[in-house]
């Protein structure tokens, strides 16, 4: 069976076609600038030259139609007919409290996703548009929604509730939801395989550290706490997001400094985090370069804050679970920034964590590598995430 995985943004679309008989990616691509000038598709197939198509795309339906054409293209495609696509798995950011697992998409599901839009106004609308576009072009192909929030629905009330008036939860659904669930679930499962143990017997801290950052306590294969909250703004410092701050700062900026709510929202989401502290940008390679070449004090401070916050969260989740057996680092920074891993892991011997600094210094770990010492009671491993494969697996499970 071949599963097409779709991830729609507001003006972009990522896709991957996966052969589930061997879990190999047949083709992957990115469509950019949908609905604006300069629309472009870039498709990569193993053993073939990169295929680039520049053509106007007025909406996501146009984009998905182009994707399907490229997949069956005589010279650049990988399948002879769309009939070879057994199912489509859609990444959906927010499933609210209704969906604790992936679900086959029908009209009831689409209606529910629409209701969750108020919880994820930036992300769910393009997800829904992508689903509707696929349904129009592939009406007989089963579709599955795989939610970023679903994995975290196992969190207990004491972890997901905010200390706000209770009615804000019961009436307005204000609570911690958590995100990156597909990634956390995937790397926790891979960690259990590497340790040759049943995941139900393990306490794992998974650190998804990219432009967005979230850390999760996975106890017995279930998420019991996570750093992102009601929105993906909460938690650890991120590329341009602040992470957790004193909520009174918002009041101060509005009342004392005269900012509008929209301006504060823009500051917290787009002008803070790594960008805000360093003044350089969101790309961690630029931060590293500023430290190594210029000894830039703000770049160094950015690294120190980042590592400190990750360390603090690992310690907190070890306390929550009553210990920790393994720690996983994944996503762009987690996989390729040894400076952050070393800052997060040094002086943690009291928890049984002993990091091998020489192994850790590898910038390009590739398919995964243990960076803890042989004597370490806690296994620390870098595992590249594969959210697309996880989405495809969950899709196949529901439609086979």
From Swiss-Prot:
Location in or out of the cell: Cytoplasm
EC number of the protein: 2.7.2.1
Originating gene: ackA
Annotated site (Transition state stabilizer): 180, 241
Biological or metabolic pathway of the protein: Metabolic intermediate biosynthesis; acetyl-CoA biosynthesis; acetyl-CoA from acetate: step 1/2
Cofactor annotation comment: Mg(2+). Can also accept Mn(2+).
PROSITE patterns noted in UniProt: ACETATE_KINASE_1, ACETATE_KINASE_2
GO CC terms: cytoplasm
TM stretches of this protein: none
GO MF annotation list: acetate kinase activity; ATP binding; magnesium ion binding
InterPro entries: Ac/propionate_kinase (IPR004372), Aliphatic_acid_kin_short-chain (IPR000890), Aliphatic_acid_kinase_CS (IPR023865), ATPase_NBD (IPR043129)
Residue positions binding substrate: 91
Binding-site residues, ATP: 14, 208-212, 283-285, 332-336
HAMAP family per record: Acetate_kinase
Active-site residues, as the UniProt record annotates them: 148
Organism: Clostridium beijerinckii (strain ATCC 51743 / NCIMB 8052)
UniProt GO BP: acetate metabolic process; acetyl-CoA biosynthetic process
Family: Belongs to the acetokinase family.
Cofactor section: Mg(2+); Mn(2+)
Physiological role: Catalyzes the formation of acetyl phosphate from acetate and ATP. Can also catalyze the reverse reaction.
Name the record gives this protein: Acetate kinase
Keywords, alphabetical: ATP-binding, Cytoplasm, Kinase, Magnesium, Metal-binding, Nucleotide-binding, Transferase
């Amino acid at each position: 069976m071949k599963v097409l995985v779709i991830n729609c943004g507001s003006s972009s679309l990522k896709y991957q076609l996966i052969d589930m008989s061997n879990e190999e990616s047949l083709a992957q691509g990115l469509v950019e600038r949908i609905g604006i000038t300069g629309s472009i598709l870039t498709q990569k197939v193993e053993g073939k030259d990169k295929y680039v198509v520049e053509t106007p795309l007025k909406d996501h339906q146009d984009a998905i139609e182009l994707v399907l054409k490229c997949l069956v293209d005589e010279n650049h495609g990988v399948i002879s007919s769309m009939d070879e696509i057994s199912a489509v798995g859609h990444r959906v950011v927010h499933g609210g409290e209704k969906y604790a697992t992936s679900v086959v998409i029908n009209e009831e599901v689409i209606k529910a996703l629409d209701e969750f839009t108020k919880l994820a106004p930036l992300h769910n609308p393009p997800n829904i548009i992508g689903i509707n576009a696929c349904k129009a072009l592939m009406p007989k192909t089963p579709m599955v929604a795989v939610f970023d929030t679903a994995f975290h629905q196992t969190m207990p009330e004491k972890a997901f509730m905010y200390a706000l008036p209770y009615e804000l939860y019961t009436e307005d659904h204000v609570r911690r939801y958590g995100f990156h669930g597909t990634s956390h679930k995937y790397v926790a499962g891979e960690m259990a395989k590497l340790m040759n143990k049943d995941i139900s017997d393990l306490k794992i801290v998974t650190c998804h550290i990219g432009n967005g950052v979230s850390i999760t306590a996975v106890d017995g294969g279930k998420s019991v706490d996570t750093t992102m909250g009601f929105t993906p703004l909460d938690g650890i410092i991120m590329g341009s997001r602040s992470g957790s701050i004193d909520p009174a700062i918002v009041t101060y900026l509005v009342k004392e400094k005269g900012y509008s709510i929209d301006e504060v929202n823009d500051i917290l989401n787009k002008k803070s985090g790594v960008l805000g502290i360093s003044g350089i940008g969101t790309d961690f390679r630029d931060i590293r370069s500023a430290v190594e070449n210029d000894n830039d004090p703000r770049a160094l401070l950015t690294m120190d804050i980042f590592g400190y916050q990750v360390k603090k969260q690992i310690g907190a989740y070890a306390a929550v679970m009553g210990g920790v057996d393994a720690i996983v680092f994944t996503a762009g920074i987690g996989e390729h920034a040894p400076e952050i891993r070393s800052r997060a892991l040094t002086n943690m011997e009291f928890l049984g964590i002993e990091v091998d600094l020489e192994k850790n210094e590898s910038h390009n770990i590739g398919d995964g590598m243990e960076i803890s010492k042989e004597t370490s009671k806690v296994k620390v491993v870098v595992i590249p995430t594969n959210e697309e494969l996880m989405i495809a697996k969950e899709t196949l499970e529901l439609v086979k």
